[in-house]
Regions:
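Active-site/acyl-donor-binding loops of N-acyltransferases
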Residues: 1-9, 14, 67, 135-161, ...
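A conserved beta-strand-loop-helix scaffold within acyl/acetyltransferase catalytic domains
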Residues: 6-56, 60-74, 121-126, 131-149, ...
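Glycine-rich, N-terminal phosphate-binding loop and its surrounding beta-alpha-beta segment
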Residues: 59, 63, 75-123, 127
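Aromatic (often tryptophan-rich) hydrophobic motifs at membrane interfaces
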Residues: 79, 96-107, 218-335
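Short amphipathic alpha-helical interaction patches enriched in hydrophobic/aromatic residues
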Residues: 88, 205-209, 296
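Conserved beta-strand-loop-alpha-helix junction that forms the acyl-donor binding cleft
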Residues: 119-129, 294-303
């Protein structure tokens, strides 16, 4: 265990839900996966933990961990998804704060609780190389040989007409086709809209015969528990034949995240998905959101979606790769428990695919 540097202190599980959301919105790197609702729905209230790091009494970093323990032995894992949060809004981010918060996380969950700590920070390969050094110096190693997934980040600080001009020619043509259709946009955050979207999403999943990467019903429950200012944005596109496309986006911090998209069988010719994405960008611009994360690309396994997102991002879209997951542990029992649990989960997943 290493003490935090002078002037820094940490607190664990000393914050209530309402206060957590107030703190969450103070960080530019805040996101859906660090919301109280996400952790509670995914793991249950008893299995989430909240850590604060303070400098001279002022909160400068926070992290929500999801705790999973093996029965009886008490060993297990603490997982920080898309965290910790340490980049303040409207102020320069300090890498030293990142050091202090991952040290505090390690002190609590590795040293005090004997868990395997795994973090998935919002850091990219093209970020300063100092972060890899900090992670190593604070006792973290990359989780196996795993490297992070790729995504495309759009900079929304440019004028709207410049963003439109940056769209690749194919995307511009499809958007013009959609704008000539008699399409109606329905938007909001109500549960009724989520239900309509799920019906369309399930139809698309069945048509394309692919396995859902995320449990859409789980996200609906999360939406019901999120406070108004943190709820996901739902946008639906209706043609004369009915609902033709939809999307769900999360805006908690300075980066909007594209979570789900769907197109109905009858709506495939309307190009509604192009119109929705552009209307979403207009809405994000009005809210002064700085960036739009198109949330995952894989040219090999999903070339169609990759092309759609690449063309939307345009020549100035930032194609980035996350640094990946990092972990730290001092307990052989926790390492063994997590390894067995993940192996069983992988086997169960393989059996479900058959």
């Amino acid at each position: 265990m290493r003490k935090l540097d002078g002037g820094y202190s940490s607190e664990v599980d000393a914050v209530e839900e309402k206060e957590w959301y107030r703190l969450l919105h103070q960080f530019d790197d805040a996101n859906m996966y660090q919301t109280w609702a996400y952790g509670q729905v995914r793991n249950g209230r008893r299995n989430i933990s909240h850590l604060l790091v303070k400098e001279q009494g002022r909160v400068i970093a926070i992290a929500q961990s999801r705790i999973v323990k093996a029965p009886l032995v008490g060993a297990g894992i603490a997982y920080v998804m898309w965290g910790p949060l340490w980049r303040p809004r409207e102020a320069r981010a300090d890498a030293e704060v990142f050091r202090q918060v991952i040290r505090a996380l390690r002190n609590e969950y590795v040293c005090r609780r004997g868990l395997l700590l795994r973090i998935y920070p919002i850091l990219f390969d093209d970020d300063s190389p100092c972060f890899l050094s900090i992670l190593a110096e604070e006792g973290f190693t990359r989780a196996g040989d795993e490297h992070g997934s790729r995504t495309i980040i759009m900079d929304l600080n440019r004028p709207l007409d410049e963003l439109r001009q940056a769209l690749r020619p194919h995307w511009q043509r499809e958007l013009k086709v959609a704008e000539k259709q008699k399409l109606e946009i329905v938007e909001g955050s109500e549960d009724e809209l989520f239900e309509i979207f799920i019906d369309m999403y399930r139809e698309m999943v069945a048509r394309k015969k692919f396995r859902e990467p995320n449990d859409i019903d789980e996200f609906r429950t999360i939406q019901q528990r999120l406070p108004v200012e943190s709820k996901m944005k739902i946008m639906l596109c209706r043609s004369s034949e009915g609902m033709c496309s939809g999307l769900i986006c999360s805006v908690v911090g300075g980066t909007a995240i594209y979570l789900f998209g769907a197109t109905s069988t009858t709506g495939m010719k309307s190009r509604g998905s192009y119109l929705l994405q552009w209307k979403l960008i207009e809405w994000l611009k009005c809210g002064r959101v700085a960036r739009y994360d198109l949330n995952g690309i894989n040219p090999e396994t999903n070339p169609g979606t990759y092309k759609f997102k690449r063309d939307l991002g345009g020549d100035k879209g930032r194609d980035v790769r996350f640094l990946g997951r990092f972990e730290s542990c001092e307990s052989i029992v926790s390492v063994a428990s997590v390894s067995v649990g993940e192996r069983l989960k992988s086997i169960a997943g393989s059996m479900m695919k058959k």
